[in-house]
């Protein structure tokens, strides 16, 4: 690698000697390569089209054949062949260099370099649309060679660590992140068109609330106080509803100091949406309409394939209670235990289910049974509704079912994609539940909710009936791009430090 780098440094010096700065100030492209490929499909083989074009991009490959050379140039939209002819370049070369323009580009320009070219269009005898280059400009001399074009980046870990190389050599990665950007834009546009306002809330917070999660902790030097990176946007968005914003959302980064897996990254993106005068039934309607609309815009249909499994995101989606699903999968009816935790635990153990020490109530035990026996099998979009109150301290009590709340989670392809409530607006009930969470925290539950007095004060000012929804953007993008790991859809995921790095 050091020898190759030294050779490229020598070529950069050679470019300077012939008056070409290897690190240019600018260039003015007139077209994207995809635009040229699309607009000139009718150009016959072996013919030129006298349309002047200027294109810039990275050289992916090069072949020199005597007085001819063929480069492949990649820009953001796609690629195109460059047709370089010694006689043509000399005809348009107005410089007085002793080294010809053709020799300069074939001797001093490598795969990986950024290049700007001017010329006309030509379709080769073999049918390849090309730019017949009249003049060229080196834009950036690359000192590092590109990965082998046939094998690319075989090391998946290296793809994540050096995403810039992955994007150069892997068109699927470029497609994934383009789709991610379009998905985010589509979600915002859908919400904006329905009178939702996006309002930013603090990333640094004095109390980490809104989710069962362990926060990252930092310190503010001027105030000499600890602060937390937000684990959710929920509590501040609810304050905005209290203040009179009836439809509000925020799409942004969330931080949780937790494990890493194919489904989890400590830094991720979510959108939280709050609608006054709505309940969880209306939020289910909103969820399936939003996601199906985005799916059509990004994929062209609500019927997609994910990891060789056909998914149909056409509304309406199945709505079923957690209790019904657990009964169906295990034969255990948690409605029959009447709070008897020991009996519920015993039945789970008899079925071979794990019973962690944190599952210290019938509701928590039912949730454990759900996660172990039901969740992985929820492939088609399914709203799982009516959750135990024990695990839902911010959701409103169910209008009919004791010890339950009006909450749903959306599952697609065996994983949670969204979470929503009829929001708890009773300040007395909310205080009691957060105090219970505080007791759990004091007993060592590091993921229990914090007591946020300012949030409770806001509820006492008065919050209208509200439906709230959170959607994991990364997991949604995984579905829309057929990506098996969350690290495939996050441009720069958090990785363990490379022991070989300097």
Curated annotation (Swiss-Prot):
It comes from the Bacteria. It catalyses: tRNA(Lys) + L-lysine + ATP = L-lysyl-tRNA(Lys) + AMP + diphosphate. InterPro entries: Aa-tRNA-synt_II, aa-tRNA-synth_II, aa-tRNA-synth_II/BPL/LPL, Lys-tRNA-ligase_II, Lys-tRNA-ligase_II_N, Lys-tRNA-synth_II_C, NA-bd_OB-fold, NA-bd_OB_tRNA. Its EC number is 6.1.1.6. Mg(2+) 2 binds at residue 416. GO terms for cellular component: cytosol. Transmembrane segments: none annotated. It is found in: Cytoplasm. Mg(2+) 1 binds at residues 409, 416. Keywords: Aminoacyl-tRNA synthetase, ATP-binding, Cytoplasm, Ligase, Magnesium, Metal-binding, Nucleotide-binding, Protein biosynthesis. Belongs to the class-II aminoacyl-tRNA synthetase family. Homodimer. This is Lysine--tRNA ligase.
């Amino acid at each position: 690698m050091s020898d190759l780098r030294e050779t490229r440094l020598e070529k950069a010096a050679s470019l300077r000697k012939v008056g070409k700065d290897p690190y240019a100030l600018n260039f003015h492209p007139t077209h994207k390569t995809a635009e040229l490929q699309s607009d000139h499909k009718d150009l016959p083989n072996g013919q030129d089209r006298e349309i002047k074009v200027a294109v810039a991009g990275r050289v992916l490959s090069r072949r020199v054949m005597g007085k001819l050379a063929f480069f492949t140039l990649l820009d953001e939209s796609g690629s195109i062949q460059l047709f370089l002819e010694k006689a043509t370049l000399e005809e348009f070369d107005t410089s007085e260099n002793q080294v010809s323009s053709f020799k300069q580009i074939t001797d001093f320009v490598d795969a990986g370099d950024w290049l700007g070219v001017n010329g006309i269009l030509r379709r080769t005898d073999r049918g390849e649309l090309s730019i017949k280059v009249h003049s060229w400009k080196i834009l950036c001399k690359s000192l590092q060679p590109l990965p082998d074009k046939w094998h690319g980046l075989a090391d998946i870990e290296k793809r994540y660590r050096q995403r810039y190389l992955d994007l150069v050599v892997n068109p699927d990665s470029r497609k994934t992140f383009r789709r991610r950007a379009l998905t985010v834009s589509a979600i915002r546009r859908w919400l904006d068109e329905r009178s939702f306002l996006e309002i930013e809330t603090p990333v640094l917070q004095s109390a980490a609330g809104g989710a069962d999660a362990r926060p990252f902790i930092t310190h503010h030097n001027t105030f000499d106080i600890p602060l937390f990176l937000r684990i959710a946007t929920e509590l501040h968005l609810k304050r905005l509803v209290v203040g009179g914003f009836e439809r509000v959302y925020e799409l942004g980064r969330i931080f949780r100091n937790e494990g890493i897996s194919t489904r989890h990254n400590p830094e991720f993106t979510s959108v939280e949406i709050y609608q006054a005068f709505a309940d969880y039934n209306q939020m289910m309607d909103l969820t399936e309409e939003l996601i199906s609309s985005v799916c059509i815009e990004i994929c062209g249909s609500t019927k997609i394939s994910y990891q060789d499994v056909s998914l149909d995101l056409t509304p309406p989606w199945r709505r079923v209670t957690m209790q019904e699903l657990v009964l169906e999968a295990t034969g255990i009816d948690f409605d029959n235990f009447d709070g008897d935790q020991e009996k519920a635990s015993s039945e789970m153990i008899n079925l071979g289910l794990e019973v962690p020490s944190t599952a210290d109530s019938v509701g928590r035990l039912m949730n454990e049974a759900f996660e172990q026996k039901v969740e992985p099998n929820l492939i088609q979009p399914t709203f799982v509704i009516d959750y135990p109150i024990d695990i839902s301290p911010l959701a409103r009590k169910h209008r009919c079912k004791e010890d339950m709340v009006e909450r749903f989670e959306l599952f697609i392809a065996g994983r949670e994609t969204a979470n929503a409530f009829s929001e708890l607006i009773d300040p007395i009930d909310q205080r009691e539940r957060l105090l219970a969470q505080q007791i759990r925290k004091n007993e060592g539950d590091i993921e229990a909710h914090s007591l946020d007095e300012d949030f409770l004060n806001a509820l006492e000012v008065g919050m209208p009936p509200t439906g709230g929804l959170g959607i994991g953007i990364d997991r949604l993008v995984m579905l829309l791009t057929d990506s098996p790991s969350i690290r495939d859809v996050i441009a720069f995921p958090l990785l363990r430090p490379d022991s070989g790095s300097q």
